[in-house]
Amino acid sequence: MAREYIGKYIRWLNPHNPTRSYFLDRMQLSKPLVRGVGHHLYDVEGVEYLDFLSQYGAVSFGHNHPELWAALAACAQEQLPAMIQPLVPVAAQQLAAKLAAVTPGDLGITVFTNSGAEAVEAAIKLARARTGRPTILSTINGFHGKTLGALSATGNLTYQVLFGAPSPHFDYVPYGDAAALEAVLEKDADQIAAFILEPIQGEAGVIPAPPGYIATALELCRRHGVLSIVDEIQTGLGRTGALFGLPAEAGTPDILVLAKALGGGLVPIGACITTPDAWDHRFGALHSSTFANGNLVARVGLCALDILLRDDQQIVRHVAKNGAYLLQRLRELQAAYPRVIRDVRGAGYLAGLDFFPFDGDDSYTMAFFSKNDYLIAFFASYLFNVHHLVTAPVFNNSHVLRLEPPFTVGPAEIDRAIAALGALCDTLDRKDYYHLVRHLPGEAVTRVPGHRRFAAPNAPNPLPAPTQSVGPRKSFAFLVHYTELRDFVACDPSFTQFTAEELDRWRDWVQWSEPGLVYNLLQVRSRTGAVADGCLIGLPMLPADISRRGRRRMLPMLGDALTLAQSQGARIVGLGGFTSIVSKGAQSLVGKGVAVTSGNVLTTVMALEGIADVTRRLELSLPAMHTAVVGATGAIGRLASLLLADRVAGLTLIGNPRSRDALVRCRIVAGEIYARLMGRAKVTPPPVASPIDRQLREVLGPLLTTPLLRLTAAQVPLARALHEQRVVDDDGYERLARTVETAFAAAGRDAPIAFATDLRKAELPADLVFVATNSDASLIAADALTAGAVVCDVARPPNVAREVVESRDDVLVFEGGLVELPEPVHFGPNLLGFRPGIMLGCLAETVLLALEGDDRDHSIGPRLDPAEAEYLRVLAERHGVRAAPPHCCGVELGEEDFAKRQRAHAALRVELAVDKGDSATGRSVTGRSA
């Protein structure tokens, strides 16, 4: 499942195809099956499984058919030479004669191969030799094998591009479209050697040819002198309820290829069978294979044909009769679950169950499986582990379950399979996805599923209105991950059934998934009429998981997420949560072929607009509020400090207590603030200057504007230091901050910016607390906050402990950085449960840039620019993007919440006024001064 990560952060050293073995192990499909009898398989513990796959149709007669083994045993008894090329293989000649007798028309010359893909290769070579033309025409989504020529004829780029396929001279037409075929033949027949097609496109989703299509196609080929190749590797020899899938009215193709059932499930063998007119002696002289034409495999092939033809093809008639019953039962299942099963297709014992895709509205987990081509593998895992039914996906359609049982199954086995599929469909219909995934972490399933029905968190977004496309497509992608354990349930309501232990195992399992699509938003509209579309790319892990994995192992994963975003057409990619942190505010991902943003600038801007709204509703004066910024040296905390300095009475910058240079780093931020404000101290003050600005003007203004000769002896060194200050790096900012502090001390005043590493130890109580750390822990407890404090918590997950909300009615806590779009769109469960239209600022910045068509990098690194903040603020205003109403713990705050805070704070003030002792000490009942 994590193919690209082997060697990056997953060490999976199985010597037998580690990629596939990792996938099978991860999907709980690696259980050793040690015994097979008929249509039953058994594991090492003796548990029985019903085989409804028969190795993609190769085990048509069931496992270990006694007659087939007897044919092999007879070879040993007779001491028949197994391989004697270039001499005459007697059994191979006998098998060729028998095939000539049973195949349609005058198909009578056989070249044996070791597999179906090699049979297709032989057919391609023969057609080119016979016609002298290079081009092989095949169908879109056809499947003919994985050797290079057969792969080139396979009309699916997924399997081709890595291997330099398709090779030159391959072309494709839509399957079932005779008019398209005729048009190509009319135009290019003189270059086309052959047209290859399947009676049923098995790997495309078990798609039967439209009535009359095969006959028309073969007739068109005859008319234009192009050879026809019918690929019956999967459909031939009884699979469809007839000896061949080729309709009788179609006539005889020039070449027919067989494999799978011909080997009886014991030996690999393929056959390229041609008419005399299509045969070419040059091909016969030059084409050979060391291991083909062996007597051993030919004896098995002869026995397989005997079983098929016995009693007037009794086993084939059995497949026809019971295949009709299988399709009937599947269609009954579709009728019972019309929201689950999209279609049922097939013939005989080759059936496809086509499931509706999952869009993410009701489950990010199911959308992750669905959008990233793992849905049917996941269903097959559930059926195997819970119901002991062996199935598999088709190769070219990630939503079709293949049902391809051995010919030996009857009505009882079909009913058992339908019961298992019914349980799957019922669970899907009830959205009880917990009961589908709980086996994946390796838990033995013991609890019986209930019958609870779960609802999607949001109704689907309305279909987008038609728009007139102007200019390039505006598209974005955004990387998301879980922020708290409760997010697992928010995204998948049925996960409430997980026990704590189960959820822990699920978390551990899912975190090793590669980045994958979880939601597609078809349209988001600006107030200007601009339109963009986008997608969410999920990294299903918690912040602690990302932190443990570290930058070295996370960056390749994020690089793959960017590649996925580009494949979806994204022009800007936003980094949510800890994906921004681990990439140094997107700095490590710049220059990777697509624009990136950490989203930190708009998050900060909207957090400050939220503060303005909350303080207005509480009738508080922001310029009178001393403000603490917790996480002041981080990207958001630093930018917020720079911008808040224009609005509040004073600042306390709180650094990381675990960092030895925390106070130095805080002083550097203070130096940046002072440098920004000092330029204003030399000019006429604005009509409304901030308190910090006024203080700097009062203390530094004289030092900056008064000639040195008119200053006191004590002032001269400070004035010279300020004039000579050259701020070009962190050391310069730190020196500037120290100079400002000295100047304020000389004036007998405290500097307007203080520092601490703990909110409790700050010199001044904070009326407003802005929290924006990179920690995934709760850092702000109830006893750290002054009475009546307002707390803006930007951190994800929140840094303010839930007990603050539950125990401190006098304190108002709200989630900072939330944004409201002009229209109420959502991204499925919206992860954090907000109502449609409301989202995190980092996501909103990504959407905003897409709407604007701005595909430059933004919000990069730790030093965010106030000028960029102003640019995005103006952009947001133009497009109708604004700060969301304040929320706390995912719930929108109402007027009663504000009134409750006012009442509680007023009661505390009365209590403090009455309590003389506390008044004397200046301490409140909370342990912080009022």
Model segments located where?
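Conserved N-terminal phosphate-binding loop of PLP-dependent enzymes in the Aspartate aminotransferase
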Residues: 1-458
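Short acidic-hydrophobic, aromatic-tinged amphipathic segments that line or gate anion-handling sites
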Residues: 171-175, 597-598, 683, 750-758, ...
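Short glycine-/small-residue-rich Rossmann-like dinucleotide-binding loops
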Residues: 200, 773-775, 795-796
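Short, conserved loop/helix-junction motifs that constitute active-site signature segments
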Residues: 250, 782-787, 805-808
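Adenosine-phosphate binding glycine-rich loop
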Residues: 472-473, 492-499, 503-509, 513-535, ...
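Glycine/serine-rich phosphate-binding loop and adjoining beta1-alpha1 elements at the start
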Residues: 521-623, 828-833, 840
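Glycine-rich phosphate/diphosphate-binding loop of Rossmann-like nucleotide-binding domains
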Residues: 616-765
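Rossmann-fold NAD(P) dinucleotide-binding segment
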Residues: 708, 726, 774-789
